[in-house]
Swiss-Prot record:
Domain of life: Eukaryota
Domain IQ: 207-236
Family membership noted in the UniProt record: Belongs to the AAA ATPase family. DRC11 subfamily.
Gene (name only): IQCA1
Protein known as: Dynein regulatory complex protein 11
Organism: Homo sapiens
Primary location recorded for the protein, binned into one broad class: cytoplasm
Amino acid sequence: MSNAMYNKMWHQTQEALGALLDKEPQKMIEPQRNQVFIFQTLATFYVKYVQIFRNLENVYDQFVHPQKRILIRKVLDGVMGRILELKNEMVELELTEFHYFDDILQDLKLAPQQLDIPIPKYFLKEKLEVIKGREKILAQILADSGIDTSDMKYPVKSIPFDEAVKLIQIAERARQGRLRALFMKQIYLQEYRAKQSKMLGKKVTDTWAAALRIQKVWRRFHQRKETEKLREEEMIFLGMNPPPLFNEVSATVIQAEKVDRLRNEVQIKHEEDYREALVTIKNDLKLIEGVDIKENLQDQIRHWFIECRNLTGTFPDYPDVEEGGSAIIFSDKTIQQVIEDIIANQEEEEKNKKKKKKKEKQPKKAKKQKKGTKEKNKEEDEKWKMSPSLFLPAMKEGCNAYKEIWMKKDESWNFSQDYDPELIKEEKRKELQSEIRIQVDELMRQELKNLKLAVDRERERPVKAGKKKDKKGKKGKKKEKKAKKDKDLTADRTIESLYKELVEEGLLIQALKVNLSDYIGEYSYLGTTLRQVSIEPMPSLLDVRQLITLYGIWPLGSAAVHEKAPLVKSLLLAGPSGVGKKMLVHAICTETGANLFNLSSSNIAGKYPGKNGLQMMLHAVFKVARQLQPSVVWIEDTEKTFYKKVPNAEKMNEPKRLKKHLPQILKLLKPDDRILIVGTTRRPFDAELQSFCKVYQKIILVPRPDYASRYVLWKQIIERNGGVLTSALNVSCLAKVTDGFTQGHIVEVVKGVLTDQRIRRQIHKPLTAVEFITAITSMNPVYKEEEESFKNWYAKTPLGKKRALAITGGSTEKAKDKGKRK
């Protein structure tokens, strides 16, 4: 798209955001009791903000104007934070992590795909060089230490020599047997043909009948092919089948990607020009306007001295540097306005003195209204009220800046969308004024002292420094105490050396290149409908994917969002094996460029022994994680860290080493630290629930795929592995039959069936569902009993308990009321 098209999209999005910001205070200020109405309001705002975010993210990625991008980035971070705040409000209201918006999407006439939350591309673009440099260092350390990750991708099992000889012998005998069978088949066919020729003898064939038979066979074959072709064309026309070149990359897509690359190059060039212009324009302004600004400021301050002297009879006290100096007096005000403020302040002081005298004379009122106010407060507490937002002011400020500067700005001269020098001049003029003001304040303070000595004959009163010194001394002692508590165990070591040590010990590992979009799934289309009938639906895979984006990727990717948004320090992914928990952890690191630290009990076994060693390990890990943030600390099979009873086979590994330290680590993590602790578990019921839930702030239950997700999975995984989907392959049948099997099972089966030989034979022998079904029968699915055990465990978690009480609470309260009436 062109610059004009992206500008139009931006203007439309800003208008939609402005309208939404005007509506939000009206809806949220009034307290409400109706939970359904509250959720509908929150969900509607959530869906609309997601639409705005999708458009803004696209615009920010493709805009080449550097000054517009700064404003859009500010608004974009604000929208992201607001979405997270609304999500947090919905979780607190409905007491569940999963929400369904199918009815709202229907009302707003939106497709489910429009609710998909994208990951901003600037997360990786802005630190691409840093990530590449870090990857090179990591690869170099791994190569020097003899740990090659490329060999680890395809592990090879060692086989004894005798077994290897037997395998070769079996394969050779099988090959010879196949050749022998083929030779015997050819002999049999020769003998059969000879017998047939003897039986028929020298019978003269009827050429007319032979021609008719050939025609009949040919016409049948030709008509069958023609019918198949017509049926395929009809299915393509109806949209039931994809067109023949559907999976191939079209020329339009290639051209669009090329344009994107060119826009990125222009973006970088304009950004460099803008940074250079910031320096040059400021220097030019300093030379041209610096002297005039200084003289004007001095004249204003002198005029203020004289006016204050005329009004009050004495010269004013000059504001301190800490207060802001003369900037407080003349902040967006003329000299006349400053004089009016002085008069108004004097009048207010006189009024306040009179009021104080009246209050002293009046008797104190009795405290009769306390009970009534308490009852009112209780009623207000029962009503739901939206908590104040930390991101709305930033969004409103961005919208106001857009209206003031860009809404009606004529940019016909700026076809290339380069920086606007006039805007830079306005900005730098303010900076220059504040810098010169500091120098002027020093001069004018001295001038004011001289005036006071000359006119009023006042001298400076000496400041008593004794108390201040004592206070400073006390503060110093407090700092010393804090320093003792936060003692740096590795003060004599560099971050590079600690980084190298952690890599060599296997605690800092290389994340696999997996995008979150590779986590395939489908939407839950009947979530709201099922909840209306009091049936709790199982979340779909795309619901899980959205939670990973909101709780993991967005806060780690954006520092502005992480500082103000509801803080998520730890995340637990619980689910049966094969549902993609490990893949999601690696996807978080890939999408944000985060470091991956592996603190699994199996990985830290035998490393850094003893209490001091463990303390040193955790200190080194989190010191590097803070310095090179964002960082993800992964604890695989985290239930082992919180075992109820450690199995005898695992006692030597000390799996519970981190149990006491994890809560302490979480307390030390601040909003500035973009560090996320992620735990994965396939047996959460083996852990102590109380300590488990204390450590993990957000618990996400990753389910096995439903029918819709399995249907999409089979199609995409078969195509990715070189398979061709034809009418002979009934994907719907595959999806139904494989109920209970996970993504891991499906991937394993597809890779096993689609060998190089089978892919080559697809032209003559298309794929069928039977091939995949026979391969998957040897695997164990996730049975209903296992799924129920996960549901029962989740119901015992704090959020699960609250949800259960909220569902059953209404009926119990009614029963209590009836009992009281009787």
